[in-house]
Amino acid sequence: MLNYLWFFLAALFEIAGCYAFWLWLRQGKSALWVIPALISLTLFALLLTRVEAAYAGRAYAAYGGIYIVASIAWLGLVERVRPLGTDWLGLAFCVIGATIILLGPRWSAP
């Protein structure tokens, strides 16, 4: 269960870092936004290595579902945009897929 904490923290820092670049490059904010962006993205990478997984690719694939949950939450909470029904439907499919990937090795064990 600690994996989910690492996934959610990693998602928070990844989205925050990417959003800082978005503010600079898409919304004309100060280039100083690069500093928190780089710090956030570094923390994202470090946190993702804390996940207990035998293979990086599987950890990243499972993380993708968590990232999408966090992105939709960011859309609503930070950007103040109400998610569409299709956002929720896509999110549900992604979470199911990420769960299958994350739990797959346990189901496949002899």
UniProtKB/Swiss-Prot annotation:
Keyword Cell inner membrane: yes
Pfam families: UPF0060
GO cellular component, one term: plasma membrane
Keywords: Cell inner membrane, Cell membrane, Membrane, Transmembrane, Transmembrane helix
Membrane topology category: Multi-pass membrane protein
Entry keyword annotation includes Methyltransferase: no
Transmembrane annotation, as ranges: 5-25, 28-48, 59-79, 84-104
HAMAP family recorded: UPF0060
Alphabetical list of PANTHER family matching this protein: UPF0060 MEMBRANE PROTEIN YNFA
Name of protein: UPF0060 membrane protein PSPTO_1628
Organism classification: Bacteria, Pseudomonadati, Pseudomonadota, Gammaproteobacteria, Pseudomonadales
